[in-house]
């Protein structure tokens, strides 16, 4: 099959996809929704141990714009989520996914917003951090934000928020079983980087071709993500 000319955004996404498949982020699995479409990714997120989300299997969709990485992608949970920074339709509200415009009313610094040096790896790490440490100052779900603050400020004595999350976690187990996925429940299991094999060798061929297009200057220097670090603000209280 003849290969079509790849756009700069497709080249960037191909490089990122290969990097994430070879050096995955702990707690995530990345696949393409369609092998022929680099602009739509499916993400499986495993709930971090020692948090309310422990044992959960949450699916999400990342959609990239044509001008990526100059504009940010969107990140939408497909799994029903009750969280201060997740809208009812699953869209995640987080600074790193906001366009790089100067908006004093938002309360966000320009440095907190998207810029072309960000990538999927930093998005994934930001999302998993957000799950455990919600931003209650600018919530997407006001009711969830109020409920979370009550749970946090009461040190777990107000259990309404925790009970909703546990029910959602429990509901994801059937989906994990259907997908044949073993969800990690210990820190040791969670820290294992699961490589997702490509369905064929087409991505390798495309990846190799990138170096024939004089894009060696696009090499990214990415630090390996440290494994999940517990934080008291999101840990379960007994």
Curated annotation (Swiss-Prot):
Task: List the record's Gene Ontology CC terms alphabetically.
Answer: cytosol
Which keywords fit this entry according to its UniProt record? Answer: ATP-binding, Nucleotide-binding, Phosphoprotein, Transferase, Ubl conjugation pathway
Q: Name one GO biological process term.
A: protein K48-linked ubiquitination
Q: State the Gene Ontology terms under molecular function.
A: ATP binding; ubiquitin conjugating enzyme activity; ubiquitin-protein transferase activity
The UniProt note on how this protein's activity is regulated states: Neddylation of CUL2 in the CRL2(FEM1C) E3 ligase complex increases substrate affinity of UBE2R2 and the ubiquitin-transfer rate in the E2-E3 complex.
Query: Sorted alphabetically, which InterPro entries does this protein's record hold?
Result: Ub_conjugating_enzyme, UBQ-conjugat_E2_core, UBQ-conjugating_AS, UBQ-conjugating_enzyme/RWD
What Enzyme Commission number(s) appear in the record?
2.3.2.23
Catalytic activity, as annotated: S-ubiquitinyl-[E1 ubiquitin-activating enzyme]-L-cysteine + [E2 ubiquitin-conjugating enzyme]-L-cysteine = [E1 ubiquitin-activating enzyme]-L-cysteine + S-ubiquitinyl-[E2 ubiquitin-conjugating enzyme]-L-cysteine
Name of the featured protein: Ubiquitin-conjugating enzyme E2 R2
Highest classification ranks of the organism: Eukaryota, Metazoa, Chordata, Craniata, Vertebrata
Question: What is the gene called?
Answer: UBE2R2
């Amino acid at each position: 099959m003849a290969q079509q000319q790849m756009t700069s955004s497709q080249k960037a996404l191909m490089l990122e996809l290969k990097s994430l498949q070879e050096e995955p982020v702990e707690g995530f699995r990345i696949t393409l929704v369609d092998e022929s479409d680099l602009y739509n990714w499916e993400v499986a997120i495993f709930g971090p141990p020692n948090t309310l989300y422990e044992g959960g299997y949450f699916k999400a969709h990342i959609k990239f714009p044509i001008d990526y990485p100059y504009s940010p992608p969107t990140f939408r949970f497909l799994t029903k989520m009750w969280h201060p920074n997740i809208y009812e339709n699953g869209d995640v509200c987080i600074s790193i996914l906001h366009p790089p415009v100067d908006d004093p009313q938002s309360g966000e610094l320009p440095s907190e917003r998207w810029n072309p040096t960000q990538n999927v790896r930093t998005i994934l790490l930001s999302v998993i951090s957000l799950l455990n440490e919600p931003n209650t100052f600018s919530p997407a779900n006001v009711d969830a934000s109020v409920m979370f603050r009550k749970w946090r400020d009461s040190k777990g004595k107000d259990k309404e928020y925790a009970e909703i999350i546990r029910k959602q976690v429990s509901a994801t187990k059937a989906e994990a079983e259907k997908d044949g996925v073993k969800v990690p429940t210990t820190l040791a299991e969670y820290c294992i980087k699961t490589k997702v094999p490509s369905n064929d060798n087409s991505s390798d061929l495309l990846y190799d071709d990138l170096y024939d297009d004089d894009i060696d200057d696009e090499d990214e220097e990415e630090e390996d993500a440290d494994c999940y670090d517990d934080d008291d603000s999101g840990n379960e209280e007994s």
